Amino acid sequence: MIIAIDYDNILNNLTEKTIEIYNKRNEKDIQMSDLTTYNFYNCLSKEIADEIMELFKDKKLWDSLAPIIGAKEGLQQLIDKGHRVYITTSTAPENFYWKIQFLNRYFSFFNTDNVIRIMDKSLLKCDILIEDNLEQLIKHKLCHRICLDYPWNRNIDDFIYDIHRCYNWNEILDEVNKIEEENEEWEKNNR
């Protein structure tokens, strides 16, 4: 299967680290649970959202990121099973290089030629899209959609959009295996 995996918050701890750095620099106490929508401007004051958005231009932030638990092993397992895996990101062009550096540092087994910078992921032809941004998942109706749970994507009923919610990489792998088994069963019954 062709699997498109979002980069930020699926492979790395971008939002968690960004909030941590913001809180230290500003002596604030913003929590991940305060981020109730994907767009910071819809859940934080404009001043705070502006300051957080500025952090995305700071190389120190990108250098401080780490893989989330299970991401490295999960990505390796998907590749080992023979899936065609692409990492997708809707990043600013100036951050793309830093993202490639991160992959080379932590996911050296991954071919960085398979990283796609794309703002509208509904344009991707894939069997599965793994994301934390509900807007991207809702727009892409032609594939199986897996949402990694975060506070900013809890504001819909997943079943309405046939989105599979997972809480960690083990659950993501289980869901991919389930989808693969269902596809194999369908192909077997429709030959």
Predicted regions and their residues:
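Active-site neighborhood of HAD-like aspartate-dependent phosphohydrolases
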Residues: 1-51, 146
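Short, basic/glycine-rich phosphate-binding loops at helix/coil junctions
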Residues: 43-58, 82-85
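A structural signal for isolated positions on well-ordered beta-strands in alpha/beta enzyme cores
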Residues: 84-86, 128, 146
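Conserved Lys-Pro-Asp/Glu-containing loop-to-beta segment of HAD-superfamily phosphomonoesterases
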Residues: 114-140
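Acidic, Mg2+-coordinating phosphoryl-transfer loop and its flanking beta/alpha structural elements
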Residues: 130-167
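Substrate-recognition element of Asp-dependent hydrolases with the DxDx(T/V) motif
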Residues: 62-66, 71-103
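Structural recognition of alpha->loop->beta junctions
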Residues: 102-118, 159-177
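A short, structured active-site edge motif that brings together acidic residues
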Residues: 35, 86-93, 100-101, 108-124
